Amino acid sequence: MNQSFWRPLFAILLFMLVFHLTNIFFAQQGAQVAQISYSRLRAELAQDNIKKITLKGTAVTGEFRGKTRVSALVQGKEQQREFTGFSSVLPTIDDQTLVPELMARKVEVSALSTETPLLLNALIYVAPWVILIAIWWVGMRSMRSQGPSGMMGGFSRSGAKAYLAGDKMAVSFKDVAGMEDSKQELKEVVDYLRNPKQFARIGGKVPKGVLLVGPPGTGKTLLARAVAGEAGVAFFSISASQFIEMFVGVGASRVRDLFTNAKKAAPSIVFIDELDAVGRSRGAGFGGGHDEREQTLNQLLSEMDGFDQHEEVIVLAATNRPDVLDPALLRPGRFDRHVVIERPDWRDREKILQVHVRKITMNGRIDLGVIARGTPGMTGADLESLVNEAAILASRENAAAVTMEHLEKAKDKILMGSERRMIISLEEKRITAYHEAGHTLVARLLPGTDPIHKVTIIPHGMALGVTQQLPEDDRYHYPQSYLENRLVVAMGGRVAERLAFGEVSSGAQGDLKQVTSLAEKMVCQWGMSEKVGGMTFSRGEEHPFLGMKLAEEKTFSEAMAWRIDQEIAAFITRAEQRAGDLLSANRERLDLLAQALQDEETLDGSRVDEIIGSLNTAQAPPP
């Protein structure tokens, strides 16, 4: 409820309570009154030590003629103290001799009525009703101030972060490195918000909704904030998950509240992050067509389609799952413009690194181009984490500035996982060394594979050893020969274990998952099997709550399923056989590489080349 109504009432009640407690405290401190028994009262009266007395029903108060010592409890201990007054209680049996004796000893006697005053009685009966009516009145005023949402007013508020036109945003297009094509498309939105009359003069219309699509960490939210900073208009930011609540109808109410505020502040931008939280296709998943999420989506569709041209409100939204969005969201008039934000290439990665290294102290001899070329596939968020990890490493070593070595170590930590120093037996170490040597040797000898960046038998992350390959450039197409070589490299560790020890271990579990998944994609999605042909099949790709259907639908026969399984197994078997032939022909190099790993634990690409020797003398059987 509105605090401005509660504060005066709370202050009055608090003042009355403090005033009452203060009166009680000072009354008890100022009055020297002793609580005595009726027998003590008669004894003091017999000694003519009572000056005056007041009777009110069975309650008796009075004064002694002089200071009288009476036992009293002080901090839990009984002590003798002097009092000038007393109080007592008369017995229920009427004592006919008390009053005559008081009169005979010339004690001043007063009598008070036991009836409650009429005004006090009225106050006792009326006060609770007055308080209840006041609480009801304050509540109604508060709910009316929240609009038509009634008792659910607190839930119906959108909770969006609002930045008004006068507020200065900390991000602009200058702070967003790379993504030139994406920024160019969004600059049209900024130009419209800055000068809508120019667009209206020539009859152009700006898209009502712009959907930012891209993998996680590529900078979709950052780009939306930059649009707000460049446009200089009101900006409302909210995550789509904030619309959903346990109460039915709250999500739709929050959507209405968000767009009502945006229309009042027009021209404005509404940014909805993770749109797929409410924008998934209706009817997908369990729960039927009347759940809270679908009501929220329906309200969002209605709000976006109900804009008038003079309502200069543009909706930006971000998602990494455009495939699961409802088609009604993507039609012209709603999110009719899609801005695709891909992972940056090495030039954009260098620009992103230049932005992030502004915040740290750097050694002048750092070559960011080398780091950018050595981090293919990394997003802007990954590069920011890399720079931060380098700064942490430099701080841990008490270095004056971040050096190239710190950046390389940070890159390895992100690519290979955090290093774990754990004690393992010599036999376990030997098995790991041969396993990683098998991967490394196969990758080094096969033509067309990615170069070896680093191989180590020091545990990183969840792995006991890591063989890290880095492509020389960003890849957008994967030839079949390249993918088949990846299968061979992945099987190299398992084959090396069998050659060295006569059996395999559980260490190849991750490799087997990798080759099975890759072979399945080659057969079912990329049409690389001659027996299956150029058809695609959905095999474990979609989940009920993420996709367009309630459950995974099988669109092929049992005979085709058997053929797919046979082709997947054939790809893996051929890869294992090729790895076996290659390692058997180069057994001496395998042993040298495994021994070097046991001695040095970590080898970089140049050291691997030095151990293996020239490729001209290496024996690589044809595939």
Swiss-Prot record:
Chain segments annotated as transmembrane: 8-28, 118-138
GO biological process: protein catabolic process; proteolysis
Cofactor detail note: Binds 1 zinc ion per subunit.
SUPFAM superfamilies: FtsH protease domain-like (SSF140990), P-loop containing nucleoside triphosphate hydrolases (SSF52540)
Compartments where located: Cell inner membrane
Periplasmic side stretches: 29-117
Enzyme Commission number, as recorded: 3.4.24.-
Key word Cell membrane present: yes
Residue intervals on the Cytoplasmic side: 1-7, 139-623
Source domain of life: Bacteria
Entry keyword set: ATP-binding, Cell inner membrane, Cell membrane, Hydrolase, Membrane, Metal-binding, Metalloprotease, Nucleotide-binding, Protease, Transmembrane, Transmembrane helix, Zinc
Record carries keyword Mitochondrion: no
GO molecular function: ATP binding; ATP hydrolysis activity; ATP-dependent peptidase activity; metalloendopeptidase activity; zinc ion binding
Pfam families assigned: AAA, AAA_lid_3, FtsH_ext, Peptidase_M41
Membrane topology: Multi-pass membrane protein
Catalytic center residues: 436
UniProt-annotated binding residues for ATP: 214-221
Residues given in the record as Zn(2+) binding sites: 435, 439, 511
Task of the protein: Acts as a processive, ATP-dependent zinc metallopeptidase for both cytoplasmic and membrane proteins. Plays a role in the quality control of integral membrane proteins.
Family: In the central section; belongs to the AAA ATPase family. In the C-terminal section; belongs to the peptidase M41 family.
Subunit structure and binding partners: Homohexamer.
PANTHER family, A to Z: ATP-DEPENDENT ZINC METALLOPROTEASE YME1L1 (PTHR23076:SF97), METALLOPROTEASE M41 FTSH (PTHR23076)
NCBIfam families: FtsH_fam
Protein name: ATP-dependent zinc metalloprotease FtsH
Species, as recorded: Pelobacter propionicus (strain DSM 2379 / NBRC 103807 / OttBd1)
